[in-house]
Amino acid sequence: MSLMLEPNPTQIKEERIYAEMGLTDEEFAMVEKILGRLPNYTETGLFSVMWSEHCSYKNSKPVLRKFPTTGERVLQGPGEGAGIVDIGDNQAVVFKMESHNHPSAIEPYQGAATGVGGIIRDVFSMGARPVALLNSLRFGELQSPRVKYLFEEVVAGIAGYGNCIGIPTVGGEVQFDPCYEGNPLVNAMCVGLINHEDIKKGQAHGAGNTVMYVGASTGRDGIHGATFASEELSESSEAKRPAVQVGDPFMEKLLIEACLELIQSDALVGIQDMGAAGLTSSSAEMASKAGMGIEMYLDDVPQRETGMTPYEMMLSESQERMLIVVKKGREQEIVDLFEKYGLAAVTMGKVTEDKMLRLFHKGEMVAEVPADALAEEAPIYHKPSKEAAYFAEFQQMKMETPKVENYKETLFALLQQPTIASKEWVYDQYDYQVRTSTVVTPGSDAAVVRVRGTEKGLAMTTDCNSRYIYLDPEVGGKIAVAEAARNIVCSGGEPLAITDCLNFGNPEKPEIFWQIEKSVDGMSEACRTLQTPVIGGNVSMYNERSGEAVYPTPTVGMVGLVHDLKHVTTQEFKQAGDLVYVIGETKAEFGGSELQKMLHGKIFGQSPSIDLDVELKRQKQVLAAIQAGLVQSAHDVAEGGLAVAISESAIGANGLGATVKLDGEATAALFAESQSRFVITVKRENKEAFEKAVEAIQVGEVTNTNEVTIHNEENEVLLTANVDEMRKAWKGAIPCLLK
C-alpha cells in the first residue's frame, strides 16, 4: 500500500475506519481529545494496537491488581519483560509465560514456534541467559482430524524452534477437552539465570542517547497480530494467516549471544524485545517507563520488503528484533559487536525530553503522539460481572459416587486417557538434554535444571486443571497454584514464585468476566498462603470459536529452588522393601475428575475442595523430610486419583511394583481426585524418623513382583495389574490415537 491510498483523518472518522482497527467510538474520541486533533492513519494504527487488550490489559487490569506481587526474594515484579527472583549467591532466576493461542489456531507450526521465540526474547532482554523452556498445551479430542493436525504441528513448531536454538524444553503439560477443539491454547514459558549486576530494564533514559534497531529486518508479517489476539476466532480467521509471524531460530541464537555480550557493556542504557505491536510497543513503553520521549527515522529501519509504509513498519511483528538505547557516541562499538555475529545494528533515532513519540519518514513527520498516552493511558474498563448460570446448578447437585464394575479395567482405561497417558510422543521430539544441565527430565512431577557452578537446582512446572476452574473458578484457581507448588515440593524444591497465563473467553460477556474475577481471587489467596508471589504473566482473552468459550484456563508456571541437588526427588519407586505412604485424606470427590469425564462424557457438580493452610502444612512437612534425606520417591496425587498415582510411580521404575491397602469406599479410594495428597516411599530404616516428621499413613510397600496390587480394608483384592502391561497401555495411548 502506498501513502497515497491511506485514508485521511476525516475519512478515518467519518467512515469509522478506526473501528476496523479495533478502536471503539469512545476510544477514538479519547484519541482525538489527547491529540487535540484527528489522528492520521499511522497514529490511529499506533493507538489501536497499543490499546488492544493484548497490549494494554484494559479489561483485565482491575482484576490483575489483586495478585500479590512482592516478596523478600522478588527483584522485579510485573511490568518488565520478565520477573526476577533472588536465589542467593548473587544469582537470580528470570522467568515468564506467554500465550500464542490465536496464531497457533491458524498456522500451528509458526504460531507455536514464534511463541517460543518471543518468550525467550523477553527473558534475555532482562540480561539473563535462557536455560530452560516449558509449555502448557490444550487441544480438543484427538479423534478429530483437525485436532490431530493442530497437535502434531504445534509440537513440531515448539521442537523446531527450541531444538535449533539450543535451549532444552524440559517440561510442561498437555490436556485434551472438547472445548479447545477450535481454539487450542499454546502457552510457552522460559526460565533464565542472571547475576544481580547484569539485570537490565526496558527503559529509554538520557536525552540525546541513541535509539538503535538490532536483529532481523522488518517485513509485513504479523501486522495487527496484537489486535488479532484481542478478538474471537471465526471462520474468517483463516484469512488472517499474514497476522502470524514467521520465526528463524538460528537468527535468534545469534541475537541471544550478541545481546548477552552487549549487556556486559556500559554503553547499553536499555533494551526491549519487539514483541506484540513491534516497534510501536517497544519504543512507546521504553520512553514512557523512563519518563522520556523518542524520535525515530523510519527510513533507517532495515526492511525486507519494498514500499513499506510507516504504518506497516510500526505495526509489523516480524520476529528476532530488539530495540536498544545506547550512550551517545558509543554507536560504532554496538555496530561492531553485532557485525561479529552477522547481525544488523542501525541507528534510527534518539531519546528526547518532551515525552513525545515522533516518527519521521521521507523527510516528513508522520506521527506525533505522547508516549504515555500509548503505553499507560489506555482506557481501563470495569466490565460487568455475573455469576455463571451453571454454577448455582452445579453447587446444588447431590453428587453420587460413579458406578465402577471392574476396577482393573477402569484403571487401564484411565491410564489411556490422553490427559493422563504418557506424553513421551511429545517430549521425545524436544531436545531436553542440550546444555547438559537437565537433572530431572520430562515426565516427573517437575523438571529440575542445575545452576552451573553451584550445588543448587531450579525446579519448574506448569499446572492448571481447567475442568475444576470451570466448575468452581475460585476453588479451581486455588488448586492450580497449590498443585504447581506440590509438584515443586515433590521434586525437592522450595516454591519461589509464579508467572501466569490467563486464558479465557470474551471478557465482554459478564459470565466470562465472572470466571476471570473468581479464578484470580482463588489464585491470589493461594499465592499469599503459599508465599509464591506473581512476578509477571500474560492475559489471553477472546478464546472462543463460534461463540463457545474454552474452559477458563489460568495456567500457572512455577519455579522453585532446590537448595542442594542431593535433595532432588522423582516420582518413580526406587527399591523393593521401601514403605509406601499416603499423605492427605481421600473424600468421594469426583466433580471434574478424569473418571467422571470418562464415564459420562462431560463434567458437572462441585470441584474437589481445598484447605490452603492444610496444603501449606503438608508441603512444608514433605519438603523438610526430603531435605532430611528421609524420602525415596514423591508423587503428587492428581488426575485419576491414587490408583493412577501409584501406577505411575511403578511404571517409571524398572521391574518394581507395590502392594497397598486403601481404606474407605473402593471407587473413591482408587479414583477420587481429592487435593493436598502425596504418595511417598521411604526406606524401612527411616520409618520412625519419617513418621515423626510427617503426618502420613503407611499403606503398603514396594515389591519386586512387577505388579501393583491394591486391597480394601477387609484385605480383599480390588485389583492386580502387571506393570509392563500398564506401561504399554499408558505409553501407547497417544501414538495409537494419532495413527
Curated annotation (Swiss-Prot):
Catalytic activity: N(2)-formyl-N(1)-(5-phospho-beta-D-ribosyl)glycinamide + L-glutamine + ATP + H2O = 2-formamido-N(1)-(5-O-phospho-beta-D-ribosyl)acetamidine + L-glutamate + ADP + phosphate + H(+)
Top EC class, one word: ligase
Statement: the UniProt record of this protein carries the keyword Protease: no
InterPro entries xref list: PRibForGlyAmidine_synth_PurL (IPR010074), PurL_linker (IPR041609), PurM-like_C_dom (IPR010918), PurM-like_C_sf (IPR036676), PurM-like_N (IPR016188), PurM-like_N_sf (IPR036921)
A single MF term (Gene Ontology): phosphoribosylformylglycinamidine synthase activity
Domain of life: Bacteria
Binding site for ATP: Y57, K96, D500, G537
Subunit structure: Monomer. Part of the FGAM synthase complex composed of 1 PurL, 1 PurQ and 2 PurS subunits.
Record-given protein name: Phosphoribosylformylglycinamidine synthase subunit PurL
